[in-house]
UniProtKB/Swiss-Prot annotation:
Mg(2+) 1 binds at D20, E22, D172. Residues 18-179 form the Exonuclease domain. Pfam families: RNase_T (PF00929). This is Protein NEN2. Residues 200-233, 269-291 are annotated as: Disordered. Probable exonuclease involved in enuclation of sieve elements. It is found in: Cytoplasm; Nucleus. It is an enzyme of class 3 (hydrolase).
Length: 487
């Protein structure tokens, strides 16, 4: 069996396993990823030093999955892996490195962890399981803020002067470890400084950034209850305060063991962090959506008529955007009687310092079918047009909650003259005998007003636009509320 450099037979598995996989890039809908390289280092959580390392190229079952797009991404060519070991050959070593340890990496919950589980499933073996996870993308987005830009590993490395990202597993793992140490050091220093020094030394997006950052350091949903109560663990082993429980993270989409109050935090971490900043289609003239013309009833939609195509961003533009149609009509949905699963989550800010508002709703079967067909149509066109971005599914599986799928609805911001506002109209449904009417509550609601209305279990009618995006290697469809009618 392959051995890890420095591996000893007797170990307490207290080390943190930083790992990364390099893969092929799917070029058609339904195609999976194939692992081309696995790299890992084991880190002492007390001294933050690398103890052991392992890196290996992997030969996929189908070498034709290695395309020019994947070579451009990671530099791994067909000839590099033709004589390499298969994943089945290295599975014992990978299992021994990962199982029962804390896993760490950048965006591992959405990418690397699923790839490991898929690879073990393909060879008919149970996958390794972590005792905790540290996803530096979600962690640093929450704690370090947007001062380093888009929070991609290459951007963070540039911010700290660590050189260029090679997109090779062992190099990326070591870079991830260094970035995490740098960020942790900055946050530790900031937690000890007066507010006015932090305000003078850190570029902020809102006046609340400093105090919010200090509150986050003191108490975070990623921090264990013991840390929050006593601070003892954070004093002895600071990096362990970053660990999320394995119970909550075994499956990045399995929320069955989470408490309802922390579930919105987990769901929020899946949001592409700035895609709406580059979707110019969101900034439109102020118009009322009080009439329902153009929004289609679900029972009148034939999923076979849903299509996606590229259209000009605006009349006369040479820039193209992806748009969904039902036949020849732009697809917009009228969705009655939606139930709110998780209320407004507005902890992230856009570049203008405004809270980004979204909430999660349960999907009934007819709506779920329409959204899945939209996802499939848009992803097909995206892949066919040469996009190598990771696709974020529109429908979110929610195992453990009667297996009811969910989706996230975004509240847009729009420019009306010189005034920024939240653009979804909010109405209240009122009944007089057998007659139902809609009373306009606000056409430019404040964040606090929206937050107070959209509580869990609230029932509402939603008038939604579907807005595909492809930004910073993340692509998908956003459901955007144009009008909400509260029951």
């Amino acid at each position: 069996m392959l051995t890890m450099v420095g591996l000893t037979p007797a170990e307490d598995r207290s080390e943190i396993a930083f790992f990364d996989v390099e893969t092929t890039i799917p070029f058609r809908v339904g195609q999976g990823y194939a692992i081309l390289e696995f790299g890992s280092i084991l880190v002492c959580p007390k001294k933050l030093v690398e103890l052991k390392n392992y890196s290996v190229l992997v030969r996929p079952a189908n070498l034709n999955l290695i395309t020019p797009r994947s070579v451009k991404c990671n530099g791994i060519k067909r000839e590099d892996v033709e004589s390499a070991l298969t994943f089945a050959d290295i599975a014992d070593t990978v299992y021994d490195i990962l199982h029962g340890r804390i896993w760490a990496g950048h965006n591992i919950l959405k990418f690397d962890c699923p790839r490991i589980r898929e690879a073990f499933a393909e060879i008919g073996r149970d996958p390794p399981e972590p005792k905790g996870t540290i996803d530096s993308l979600a962690l640093l987005t929450q704690r370090f803020g947007r001062r380093a830009g888009d929070m991609k590993m290459a951007t963070l490395a540039t911010y700290f002067g660590l050189g260029n990202q090679t997109h090779r597993s062992l190099d990326d793992v070591r870079m991830n470890f260094e970035v995490l140490k740098y960020c942790a050091t900055v946050l530790f220093l900031e937690s000890s400084l007066p507010d006015e020094l932090i305000e003078n030394s850190v570029t902020t997006t809102t006046p609340e950034t400093s105090s919010r950052r200090r509150r986050t350091i003191k108490k975070s949903p990623l921090q264990s209850p013991t840390d929050q109560q006593t601070g003892e663990n954070m004093t002895t082993i600071p990096i362990l305060s970053f660990v999320s429980s394995a119970e909550a993270q075994t499956d990045p989409f399995d929320m069955s063991t989470l408490r309802n109050e922390i579930a919105p935090e987990v769901l929020q971490s899946d949001v592409p962090m700035e895609e709406e900043q580059n979707q110019q289609s969101e900034t439109v003239a102020s118009e009322g959506t009080g009439d329902q013309e153009g929004f289609m009833e679900l029972d009148k939609i034939s999923v076979s008529s849903i299509r996606a195509t590229h259209v000009p961003l605006y009349d006369g533009s040479q820039t193209m955007k992806l748009q969904l149609f039902l036949g020849d009509r732009p697809l917009q949905l009228h969705c009655p009687r939606l139930k709110v699963r998780f209320g407004i989550n507005g902890k992230f800010m856009d570049k203008a310092g405004r809270r980004r508002l979204n909430f999660v709703i349960d999907l009934y079967p007819s709506l779920c079918n329409v959204l899945q067909e939209c996802d499939s149509a848009a992803q097909t066109i995206s892949v066919d047009s040469g996009s190598g971005s990771d696709w974020n599914p529109l429908v979110i599986p929610m195992k453990g909650f009667l297996n009811c799928p969910t989706a996230r609805i975004h509240i847009p911001t729009e420019l009306n003259g010189d005034i920024d506002r939240y653009a979804a109209e909010i109405h209240q449904k009122e009944f007089s005998g057998a007659t139902a009417t809609q009373k306009l509550i606000s056409s430019n609601p404040k964040a606090e007003e929206i937050e107070s209305l959209l509580n869990p279990r609230t029932v509402l009618d939603a008038f939604l636009s579907l807005e595909p995006y492809d930004y910073q290697q993340r692509a998908g469809i956003r459901l955007v509320a144009r009008k909400l009618v509260i029951h």
